[in-house]
Amino acid sequence: MAPLTLATYDEIKEVRTTEAVVLSTAVSWGGLVIAGERSGVGKTTVTLALLTALAQKSSRVQSFKVGPDYIDPMFHRQATGRPCYNLDPILTSETYVQQCFAHRCQDAEFALVEGVMGLFDGASGLSDVASTAHIARLLNLPVLLVVDCSRLSRSVLAIIHGYRTLDPRVRVAGVVLNRVGSDRHLELLTDALASIDIPILGVLRRQGAIALPDRHLGLVPTAELPQIPNILTRLAHLGQTCFDWPVLTPLLASSSPSQLPICPPTYLLPHSPTPAPRIAIAQDAAFSFYYPDNLDILTTLGAELIPWSPLDNEQPPADIDGLYFGGGFPEVFAADLAANKKLRTELKMRLQDSLPTYAECGGLMYLADTLVDLEGQSWPMVGVLPTTVRMATRLTLGYRQAVVQQPNFLLAQEQTVWGHEFHRSCADTPAENPVYQLKRYGAAQPHDAEGWSLRQVHASYLHLHWGGCPEVAQAFVAACRQYRYRA
C-alpha cells in the first residue's frame, strides 16, 4: 500500500472543507453495499457469510462499516484478516469517506460495505445524512438489500418496491430473502416479486445455529468468543451455498473511478526526525474500541505503538511516553481490573506525574475512583478522576458537536470536534471544569457538558475519529514527544 502523504496544516484545513467529488452515474465503483430494510434483519450475518466465503477465494478482501460502530468491524477482521474501516461523513467528512474507500481498496480484489440500521436511516429524520444510502451515493456502489421474511408473503413486494423507488440515485441491485421458512413460503415470496423483476441473489432459511451472541451494547466482541472459528466456518458454508455467486462476484470486484484520484485519507504535518515517542495502547478484552485510522494516524505522525493488556500485566510497558485507553467493557472485567492493584497504583503515579494520556469512554471508566457494575458491585479503579462511574439502564447514544470550554494539551479554546457517544454508564460527580459543551446532531442548543482534563490526562465519553480532527492526534504525539525529552 502506498505511504501516506504529508502536508501542511493549511492543506489539512483545505482538504477537510473540500466538497466530495460528485461521481457520474455512468461510473461504477467496484464493490457492494449490504443494507437492511431495518435493524435486526440479519445484515451482519449476510455480510459475514459473504466475507468468509470470499476470504476462502482471496486474501485481498477489504471490508468497511457505515457509521461509528466498533464491534461489527471486529467480526469483519476475523473473517478477512484485514482491518475494517469505518465510513462516517459526520465524524470525518464526505471527502474523507471517498478517499478512505479508494485508498484502502488499492490492493483489494473484493470490496464490501456493511450498512447501518435501515437503508435510509441516518442521523436525522429530515434527511438520510450518514445513512447507508448516503454512503452508497457517495461511492456510486450498488446495494444488496436484506429483508426479514419471517412474517411476510406478498407484503414483501411493497417493502422492496418502496426501497427501490424512494431515491432513484440509490441502485438496489438485488435482494437477500432472510429467515425463509418452508419451500412453500419461498414460492409465495418469489411469486410476489416476479412483477418487479428484482434479482433474488440470496436465500437464507430460518436457523439459530449461527446466531451471534449479544448483550447491553450490541454484539459480544470477538475477543470474548472462543467459539469464533466455528462460527466463521458455519458462516462460510452459508456463504458458499446460499448466494448467487455468478451475479454477485462481478458486483464485489474492487476498482476505482477515474474521476477521483487515489490518495490517502490522512493529511498531516511531517513528523519530527527525532526518535519516535512510544505510546502504549491498551488492547485486550476490556479495551478494544479503536478506529484503525486513529492508530494509522499516530504511526504516520511518527509514534511507535506498543500494544499491552491492563488485564494481563502488572506494569505498563517500559520506557513509554504516552498512554491511549480506548473504549470497551471494563464493567464486564471490573473484578479483574480491580484485582490488579499493582498496576492501578503504578498508573496513578505515572498519570499524576503528567504522562500524556488519552482515554475514551471505557478508558474514562477505568481511570475513575470507583466503578459500579451491572450488579451494583463497587470496584476500585485507577483513581485519577475524582468520580464514581455507575452502570445505568439508560443508553446514551448519538452524534455530538463538542465545543471546547476547557482547553488542554490536546484541544484549543472554542475548538469544535464531532464525536459519538455510546454508553450505559454515567459519572456520579461531573467534572469541575468540563472539557466540552455538547450539542446533539441537529439541535439548536447545547444539552450537556462533560470531559475531564487533569495534568496531561484527557478523559471523555466522546469517541473521536481522528480522520475528522487530525490536529488532536498531532497534539497528542507532540505532547508525548515533549514528555520523552523533558528535563
Set out the residue ranges of the language-model regions.
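C-terminal and late-domain segments of enzyme folds
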Residues: 136, 287-300, 304-305, 394-487
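Acyltransferase
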Residues: 222-275, 283-287, 449-487
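Cysteine-nucleophile active-site neighborhood
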Residues: 330-408
